[in-house]
């Protein structure tokens, strides 16, 4: 069966033909590739085509596809049982592994998705502060829970809808929206609202394209939260163990009250988490009155994959230097080639994350990102795919480098960029 036939068939049974909207390739006027398997830095579709994969399952695969150590850990766990609905020692081991490197985090709770992690973190913040409102930033995506689908990035940006049908006004009214990297917009909202329970932010935004928050902005944001008895939540579902081993904390050294994790923490399996100091975490049920639960939370296969992934990342001291150098080579190479062709392009990287925008002006917030030439991006994406390079099918997503990539792969990619720029 071909990709085209597979998508047509799938659309008969799965809404939209996909289980997450961006996978449909709708915003690049194309149809998705159905993947048969992956190996290292490559994926292979059912038509027999191979691609250098810069999506890496949207970030979780720090060590690429089919990493032997992670596979071995999963197989060992599977032989003992796939799920118990009861505590296992694997949960404790992964909890210790995560918390050991964050001096301000004392306890953690595992869930199955980033959406669950951010949703639970906000409920926890409201329960702890006894306040109602939350403040988020325009273009930051924190999953698809109702209160966070307001001025969201990622899928919402891709499909030109700042919110979603089905989100009640009574829910949305409790969500305040500030401008990313603009501290004055934050101050204005705090002046008008005295009941803000938490501020949630991607300290390294990856869902309006890659847009890092400025150091002075984050420092001032932390001060405002502290002065107003408002909890600061860093959503590191994407940037955790990607920007550095310690995520944004390893770069900005700001101690958020709550951190959410995901993607890499599960080693490619469904897992996420939220963590904080004990006095906050201890109001979670069964100790306190904030309820959170999940049938597959702390699933042993996901815990085993997470332990293997993080242990390997921690041992390889030069891993992040290597990934960062490759990401830098890629983005600088893209910028140079674009300049040579007179194409408007902004490109940057943070650790193993990279992003690019088809716009002539620097991008520091959501409105800047929206100025990108989407038609140009669509043409570029199509040409890169034809040249064997699998990039995220949205201008408003982030790309990822994995450990199985090397200079040769980056050189191959840049040659594809050169050819694609010639055609567009």
From Swiss-Prot:
Keyword hit for Repressor: no
N6-(pyridoxal phosphate)lysine modification, residue list: 263
EC number: 5.4.3.8
One Gene Ontology term from the biological process aspect of the record: protoporphyrinogen IX biosynthetic process
One GO term describing the cellular component: cytoplasm
Signal peptide positions (record): none
Subunit structure: Homodimer.
Protein name, UniProt field: Glutamate-1-semialdehyde 2,1-aminomutase
Gene: hemL
């Amino acid at each position: 069966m071909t990709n085209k036939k597979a998508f047509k068939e799938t659309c008969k049974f799965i809404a939209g033909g996909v289980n997450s909207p961006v996978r449909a390739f709708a915003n690049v006027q194309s149809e998705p590739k159905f993947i048969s398997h992956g190996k290292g830095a490559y994926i292979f579709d059912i038509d027999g085509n191979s691609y250098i994969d810069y999506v890496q399952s949207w970030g979780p695969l720090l060590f690429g596809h089919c990493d032997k150590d992670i596979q071995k850990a999963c197989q060992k766990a599977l032989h003992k049982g796939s799920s118990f609905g009861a505590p296992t020692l694997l949960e404790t081991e992964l909890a210790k592994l995560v918390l050991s490197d964050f001096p301000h985090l004392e306890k953690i709770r595992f869930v199955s998705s980033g959406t669950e992690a951010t949703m639970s973190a906000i409920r926890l913040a409201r329960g702890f502060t006894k306040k109602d409102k939350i403040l988020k930033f325009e273009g930051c995506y924190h999953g698809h829970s109702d209160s966070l689908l307001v001025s969201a990035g990622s899928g919402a940006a891709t499909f030109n809808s700042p919110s979603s049908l089905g989100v009640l006004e009574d829910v949305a009214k409790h969500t305040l929206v500030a401008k990313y990297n603009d501290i004055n917009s934050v101050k204005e909202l705090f002046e008008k609202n005295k009941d803000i329970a938490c501020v949630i932010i991607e300290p390294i935004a990856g869902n309006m394209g890659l847009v890092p928050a400025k150091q002075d902005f984050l420092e001032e944001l932390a001060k405002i939260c502290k002065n107003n008895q408002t909890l600061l939540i860093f959503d590191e579902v994407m940037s955790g163990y990607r920007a550095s081993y310690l995520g944004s904390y390893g770069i900005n050294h700001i101690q958020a009250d709550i951190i959410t994790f995901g993607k890499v923490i599960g080693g490619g399996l469904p897992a996420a988490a939220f963590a904080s100091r004990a006095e906050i975490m201890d109001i979670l049920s069964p100790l306190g009155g904030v309820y959170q639960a999940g049938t597959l939370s702390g699933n042993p296969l996901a815990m085993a994959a997470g332990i293997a992934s993080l242990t390997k990342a921690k041992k390889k001291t030069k891993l992040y230097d290597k990934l960062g150098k490759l990401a830098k080579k890629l983005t600088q190479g893209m910028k140079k080639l674009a300049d040579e062709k007179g194409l408007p392009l902004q490109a940057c990287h943070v650790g193993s994350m990279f992003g690019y925008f088809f716009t002539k002006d620097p991008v520091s917030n959501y409105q800047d990102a929206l100025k990108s030439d989407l038609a140009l991006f669509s043409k570029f994406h199509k040409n890169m795919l034809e040249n064997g390079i699998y990039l995220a099918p949205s201008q408003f997503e982030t790309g990822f480098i994995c450990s199985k990539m090397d200079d040769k792969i980056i050189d191959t990619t840049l040659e594809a960029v050169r050819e694609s720029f010639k055609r567009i």
